[in-house]
Amino acid sequence: MALPDFNIRQLLEAGVHFGHQTQRWNPRMAPYIYGDRNGIHIMDLTQTVPMLDQALQAVRDTVAKGGRVLFVGTKRQAQKPIAEAAERCAQYYMNHRWLGGTLTNWKTVSNSIGRLKSIDEAMEGGFEGLTKKERLGMERDQGKLQASLGGIREMGGVPDLIFVIDVKKEDLAIAEANKLGIPVVAVVDTNCSPDGVDYVIPGNDDAARAIALYCDLVARAALDGMSAQLGAAGVDLGALEEGGVEEALAEEAAAPAES
């Protein structure tokens, strides 16, 4: 496997170059704007390409060192691609609503994850010994907790890097990452500020095709990092993108340590 290839044509076809209306711009994005067309700012894709490549390299290197990547995108059109991309590369995601303190107050979040797991165990046991009212209450709690925390329930600690779609909407996530010194990779549109983002990807953060492209590339970069991390252990990662991530990791965990 290798770092995913992409080109300007793909970015154009996905609409990555379309920014927002010129009157809604953030002057901090001026260096990345090529011009405007019919009152819409157009991104300079000759800058987006190398910056996206640097961002993908950061994701790859993080995973190659055994690090965890958290995908963050809670806007409607980002929810599904964010979750699918993270699951595809055995990473983690928040796609429902950012809970304040997810990173800065991990202990409390971890307790909530523990509650979710205990409810799941009770459900598997058929809610034995519980009244109908108690069962309904636990099912309601499970639904809420799963929506909020399902994507990070196995994360086991704060991530080593976060990938964000829409820095304006996910400003809390970025602020928490900045506070903890966690690197931020983010798509930044013309109406947003790149402040607080370590790896800026200048591009459209609204178009479904653009979001799908970013998520696909980041997932593939993470898979390449995983290949680098586990390849030396002799694990066959050829089937990773066909859904064999968990199986490969299980094989690695079950393999006896070399003396």
Swiss-Prot record:
One annotated Gene Ontology cellular component of this protein: cytosolic small ribosomal subunit
UniProtKB keywords: Ribonucleoprotein, Ribosomal protein
GO biological process, one term: translation
Listed InterPro entries: Ribosomal_uS2 (IPR001865), Ribosomal_uS2_bac/mit/plastid (IPR005706), Ribosomal_uS2_CS (IPR018130), Ribosomal_uS2_flav_dom_sf (IPR023591)
GO MF annotation list: structural constituent of ribosome
Family affiliation: Belongs to the universal ribosomal protein uS2 family.
Stated name of the protein: Small ribosomal subunit protein uS2
Organism from which the protein derives: Dinoroseobacter shibae (strain DSM 16493 / NCIMB 14021 / DFL 12)
